[in-house]
Amino acid sequence: ALLALGALGALGVAVAGQARGAGMGGMAGMPGMGGMAGMDMGQSQPTAAAPGVGVFSRALLIPPELHGQPRDGVLHYALRMAPGRSMLVDGLQTATWGYNGAVLGPTLRVPRGKAVQIDLNNALDQSTTLHWHGAHVPGEMDGGPQSLIAPGGQRRVHFTLQQPAGSLWYHPHPDTRTGPHVYAGLGGLFLVDDPADQHLGLPQQYGVDDIPL
């Protein structure tokens, strides 16, 4: 099964029996996408899966995982939204936006029942938000249009997920601008891990048999 998301076409994880992005042409004229030349947002670089038999000329890129850093009983995460440049087609650099990198974002792993704190930093030239799509969180932490982060601004969210294992995603949600922000590259997987899921015998090796597409 494949969970299709909006960022760059499709972003998800295919696993046996359950669901766990990439055309970007025409972005040069997008409002607010100027001034990106020379920017290197490579803090979070995806890895390439081993190429298999087929017609594809480029290896599938696997977004890095982001596990929270434990401190005082809380898992701490940080996401920075910033412009960058990505080679989506060989020989052609495209202006993109990303979380902790040039395009898209790392795969967040959040354990069920653990308190988390996520620090958000907006290095874009536009206001944006960060919405936890499918997560059961309080409204003030949800990252909807009412929770804008101004250019250069920061926001801290905290919550504890009490829901079963699931394949969610995170993305911007500014009023009337959600689409352009996602098309620019802002989006990432948000996986809820539940110890009760371990005995089911499902694929568990991220990037090996648990593949984000």
Identify the meaning behind each predicted range.
Residues 1-13:
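N-terminal export leaders
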Residues 6-9, 20-213:
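Histidine-centered copper-binding motifs that mark active-site loops
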